[in-house]
Amino acid sequence: FGHFEIQSFKFNHYKVCDDGFKSADLLDKSKLTISGHFHHREERKYENGKILYVGNPFQMDFGDINSSKGYYILDFETLEYEFTQNKKSPEHHKLKLSELLTAKDKKWQKKVAGNFVKFYVDQQITNDDIDALLQMLSKLKPLSLNVDYTNRIDFKVEDDTGYDFSG
């Protein structure tokens, strides 16, 4: 067990470790190395053993979107381990206006309730409609609701699209 940096393992979805221990050096000393330094869960099997990064037990930020988080149970006799997914902690989700407007069901609402949400306004919508939509999203009680207008088309009151967000 350790809190190691091991070369070529991922810190997260975007960055790989260039420094630290070499896998071969650790596996020369042990058949199983378990580390918790990186937040990204990753397992590698080699001819002479395994290296396991357990990762965080819960999502930390929007970089963890679509990452399965949880914990491991280790059998000290056999060195076998089993991952258990954390289904209790809040998650981070990104939603786009265009996705909500074309959704055929309301499954997206589960992504909002009790979670951290980044909402992208990626198409034209009136000020009144965006206000109504944000009120509706807020009623689902997200832990955090951040709105990103970066890619929006300018809002125009006269371009009333008449979207129905009543649920």
Where are these regions (language model features)?
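Short, solvent-exposed loop/turn segments at secondary-structure junctions
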Residues: 5-7, 40, 58-59, 124-126
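Small-side-chain structural scaffolding
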Residues: 2, 70, 139-142
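Histidine-centered active-site/metal-ligand motif
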Residues: 3, 37-39, 93
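Conserved hydrophobic/aromatic beta-strand scaffold that supports enzyme active sites
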Residues: 1, 71-73, 92
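Accessory, non-catalytic peripheral segments of nucleic-acid enzymes
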Residues: 76-167
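Structural motif
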Residues: 1-3, 34, 118
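Conserved beta-sheet core of the metallophosphoesterase superfamily
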Residues: 12-77
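Short acidic, glycine-rich surface-loop motifs adjacent to enzyme active sites
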Residues: 1-10, 114
